[in-house]
Design a protein with these regions (language model features):
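Short, flexible loop segments at the rims of nucleotide/cofactor-binding pockets, characterized by
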Residues: 51, 80-86, 108-112, 139, ...
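Conserved C-terminal guanine-recognition region of P-loop GTPase G domains, centered on the G4
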Residues: 62, 66-70, 89-159, 218-227, ...
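Canonical P-loop GTPase G-domain recognition
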Residues: 128-131, 136-193, 277, 387-397
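C-terminal effector/interaction modules appended to NTPase cores
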Residues: 5-7, 11, 29-35, 214-407
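Structural alpha-helical scaffold elements that stabilize or flank donor/cofactor-binding regions
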Residues: 90, 94-97, 194, 249, ...
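C-terminal end of P-loop GTPase domains and the immediately downstream helical coupling element
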Residues: 23, 163-228, 233-250, 309-312
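Conserved G1/Walker A P-loop phosphate-binding module
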Residues: 2-88, 96
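G-domain G4 guanine-recognition motif of GTPases
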Residues: 77, 108-111, 128-144, 160-168, ...
Length: 407
């Protein structure tokens, strides 16, 4: 949670973070027109287009504002029928995009649709809304009509027929995406369930070695923006000025949001009537499965000297002396269970395909991931029967104050 500093005038401050954009994945066989379609939608040459099958290798992403939806990020993927050893690796990258896809565009072009139907089933299994597009020039549509009608019967929905090479393909695709927009994309907020207009909220934000000079970390920025959107009165302080900040206020804040690592300090000094939470806990609710995280925190008591814990960070950064995930949480666990307790750390999109060797997973707040991606990891943990919790939840549990915080 602490590794993503953003400065006042850099691109991160000007653009909506990808983590809160709607993720739209474009899938299909090689040479089905995926890249051509993306270029038509964005009205830019985002992806290289070639008659040679397999032009797209690693996924290509493009962030943009889509009228009627808002901030989105498109992913153009390698064909899922790619062949050979390199092809297998490309398909694995395509599978990774699947884990964070909110809406899928499945592009059809050939009469043999067996590959596409396998992926359609995979998308439906993951409960991902699917927009099926038949890419064909006008002159070729009659030839494919029987297959298109067969596809409509199999999917139970309308198949959008467009020519991806034409600019006019973008508008019907945009309208179809609006119809598929998941309700939670527009309804969920970070703090909206805890605050109302004119509430006073105090943010306690230690400016330690992990917060680069002149910057706030991304979870703090996103939370401040969310509070302002809800018409709250936002005050802020560092942990060492908490008492002075509280004394300066005319009334106790309704809510105090702190960095998880100073939970005990803030809990001890907060007014009795003020609610307490942390940025990490808020993001556990916003991005993950908060009930599973809370339930899984109890697994900390079941650890022993030979246990193995996986710590997962969404961002990639060089470890620092006060790093909460790489230093502080492992130190807390080893203080209780001994140095022989093994702690593995993964970052970015790295995540084990097999979790069976672990007794517990502790995930960061995932400010760099969208909710779909976090929940795909939670679902994997659930299916393998492995407890999974979150930095803030784990710290609150180990400090004995979990029942006193709000989420």
């Amino acid at each position: 949670m602490r590794g993503n500093g953003i400065s006042g005038f850099d691109m991160s401050m000007q653009d909506t973070p990808n983590a809160v954009r709607l993720h739209i994945g474009i899938f299909g066989k090689r040479n089905s027109g995926k890249s051509t379609l993306l270029n038509a939608i964005t009205k830019q040459k985002v992806s290289t287009v070639s008659p040679v099958a397999g032009t797209t290798t690693d996924p290509v992403s493009k962030a943009m504002e889509l009228h009627g939806i808002g901030p989105v990020v498109f992913y153009d993927t390698a064909g899922f029928d790619d062949e050979g050893e390199l092809g297998r690796l490309r398909v694995e990258k395509t599978e990774e995009v699947l884990q964070k896809t909110d809406i899928a565009i499945l592009v059809f072009r050939e009469l043999d649709i067996s590959w596409e139907m396998k992926w359609y089933a995979k998308l439906k299994e993951k409960q991902i809304p699917v927009l099926c597009i038949w890419n064909a020039a006008t002159a070729d549509r009659d030839h494919a009509m029987d297959t298109i009608q067969k596809l409509e019967r199999k999917t139970g929905g309308e198949i959008l027929v467009v020519n991806a090479a034409e600019d006019m393909a973008a508008e019907p695709v945009r309208q179809a995406l609006i119809r598929l927009l998941p309700s939670e994309f527009t309804e969920e907020t970070i703090t909206g369930h805890l605050v109302t207009a004119n509430d006073l909220v105090l943010l306690v934000m230690p400016q330690d070695i992990q917060a680069p000079k002149g910057r706030l970390i991304l979870p703090q920025v996103q939370t401040i923006r969310d509070l302002l959107d809800h018409k709250c009165i936002v005050q802020s302080c560092t942990s060492d000025t908490l008492e002075a900040a509280l004394s300066a206020l005319a009334k106790p804040p309704k809510l105090i949001i702190t960095d998880s690592q100073v939970f005990p300090l803030v809990y001890e000094k907060k007014p009795e009537e003020s609610l307490l939470t942390s940025f990490s806990v808020l993001f556990a609710n916003y991005k993950g499965d908060i009930q599973y995280f809370i339930q899984s925190a109890k697994a900390i008591d079941q650890l022993h000297a030979d246990s193995k814990v996986l710590i997962a960070e969404a961002c990639t950064h060089a470890p620092l002396a006060e790093d909460i995930g790489r230093v502080k949480i492992p130190a807390m666990l080893k203080k209780k269970y001994g140095d022989s307790l093994q702690v593995d750390i993964v970052s970015g999109t790295d995540f084990p395909k097999n979790l069976q060797e672990y007794n517990l997973i502790i995930h960061c707040g995932a400010c760099m991931f969208n909710k779909k991606y976090v929940l795909s990891r939670v679902e994997q943990a659930k299916q393998e029967g492995i407890p999974m919790t979150n930095y803030g939840i784990a710290i609150a549990y180990m400090k004995g104050i979990l029942e006193h915080i709000i989420y």
